């Protein structure tokens, strides 16, 4: 994408590429409501024509789609008002040795275990107070992925990551009416979940 952008006239460009895979289990009233498997990947290209800038993105990684996406960004940049602040960082300011941020902790959990954790979260929320009369459900999500950023100044770095969460939402009712409340915990490691 970067070479394509330069060959089509961009004065500079940056590309971000990401991919995520995960599962999300939802229960409602202690029964499994849905099980979703996700696999998303996309890229975004930022092009510069002098001090004019535009961004386009796609989830299609075929060469023809990359070319089409770069051309779309360049077409937009041609009609964008220049801004003196637009541009890539100076080459001497680019990070050449990025820190490892410890963001990757896959959660080895089966679908059945995710369902059980969602059931437990929902039950805990329902048991908080006798005024809690119904549930909007509980959800357990686990995701792993990777991110890469590169630019025409030679920067190319990325990192793997994980994201896990447990959510629940319940409805309480008394003589004054009804109220919805929710609880959420998330972290890069399942050990961070409350």
Give the location of each predicted region.
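Active-site bordering "gate/hinge" segments
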Residues: 1-194
């Amino acid at each position: 994408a970067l070479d394509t952008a330069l060959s089509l006239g961009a004065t500079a460009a940056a590309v971000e590429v990401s991919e995520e895979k995960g599962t999300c289990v939802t229960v409602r009233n202690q029964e499994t409501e849905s099980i979703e498997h996700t696999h998303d990947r996309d890229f975004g290209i930022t092009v510069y024509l002098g001090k004019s800038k535009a961004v386009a993105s796609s989830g299609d990684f075929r060469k023809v789609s990359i070319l089409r996406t770069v051309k779309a960004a360049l077409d937009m940049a041609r009609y964008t008002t220049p801004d003196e602040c637009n541009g890539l960082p100076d080459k001497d300011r680019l990070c050449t040795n990025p820190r490892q941020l410890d963001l990757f902790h896959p959660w080895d959990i089966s679908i059945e275990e995710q369902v059980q954790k969602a059931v437990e979260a929902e039950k805990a929320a329902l048991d908080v107070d006798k005024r809690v009369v119904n549930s909007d459900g509980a959800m357990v999500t686990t995701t792993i992925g990777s991110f890469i950023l590169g630019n025409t100044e030679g920067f190319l770095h990325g990192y793997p990551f994980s994201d896990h969460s447990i959510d629940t939402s319940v409805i309480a009712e008394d003589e004054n009416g009804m109220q919805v409340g929710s609880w959420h915990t998330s972290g890069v490691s399942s050990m961070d979940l409350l």
